[in-house]
Curated annotation (Swiss-Prot):
Gene, per the UniProt record: engB
Cited function: Necessary for normal cell division and for the maintenance of normal septation.
Cofactor: Mg(2+)
GTP-binding listed as a keyword: yes
Location of the EngB-type G domain: 25-199
Source superkingdom: Bacteria
Name of the featured protein: Probable GTP-binding protein EngB
Entry binding sites for GTP: 33-40, 60-64, 78-81, 145-148, 178-180
Swiss-Prot/TrEMBL keywords: Cell cycle, Cell division, GTP-binding, Magnesium, Metal-binding, Nucleotide-binding, Septation
A biological-process GO annotation: division septum assembly
GO cellular component assignments: cytosol
Residues that coordinate or bind Mg(2+): 40, 62
Length: 222
């Protein structure tokens, strides 16, 4: 059963340049991952719609930053998949600039869901994404997708190895297994996202309240 968070999910906008990013006052959670790691499938599974985010057998198909609205001032942000060598160098460089700039400077971004294929986790580019995001001190949650491709015992070993690595090197990260095929790990991921959006939304409201109070307070000497 789809989590209530995603009940009214809908496409919002797509951009390919930083200057075109929407001027939202809400909370954003980014979904990032290596091409063909199962990012679009994970989004579709969470939302409960097969073609909500386009799934392609061709890696690197997501070429823009796609915004999906989950309700008032809450957005899932689907970032371009990285690491597909067949994409021309100029486009890969553009994506790199787009991704790093968005992740490091977007004020409304609360956290990142990082998608990794459980059979090939912690690639060089995955670590680069973690390094880009580390300086923001914002939370990261790793979904080890395609867990159905491994036996339960091997999946557990992979999970523990990744968790141990992240605990030592990226303590702001959490991790879980996930399978779109078996619809496994959906409840855990959905609840985490709900908590992130709730916490982020409360922070935004508090900041807006403080700004309003500052405007109401007369300057000394008035």
């Amino acid at each position: 059963m789809t989590h209530p968070l995603f009940r009214h999910a809908e496409f919002y906008t797509t951009v390919n340049r930083l200057q075109d990013l929407p001027q939202t006052a809400g909370v954003e959670v980014a979904f990032a991952g290596r091409s063909n790691a199962g990012k679009s499938s994970a989004i579709n599974t969470l939302v409960g719609r097969e073609r909500f985010a386009f799934v392609s057998k061709t890696p690197g198909r997501t070429q823009h930053i796609n915004f999906f609205q989950l309700g008032e001032e809450r957005f899932m942000v689907d970032l371009p998949g990285y690491g597909y060598a067949q994409v021309p160098l100029a486009i890969r460089q553009h994506w790199g600039h787009l991704l790093s700039s968005y992740l490091q400077t977007r004020q409304s971004l609360y956290g990142m869901i990082l998608i990794m294929d459980i059979r090939h986790p912690l690639t060089k580019l995955d670590l680069q994404m973690l390094d880009w995001f580390r300086q923001t001190k914002k939370p990261v949650h790793v979904l080890l997708t395609k867990a159905d491709k491994l036996s339960k015992s091997r999946a557990l070993v992979a999970l523990n190895e990744v968790r141990q690595f992240l605990t030592v090197n990226y303590p702001h990260c959490t991790v879980q297994t996930f399978s779109s095929l078996k619809v496994a790990g959906v409840e855990e991921a959905s609840q985490l996202l709900q908590n992130w959006f709730d916490t982020g939304h409360a922070s935004v409201q508090q900041e807006n309240g403080e700004i309003s109070e500052q405007k109401k307070t007369p300057a000394k000497g008035d």
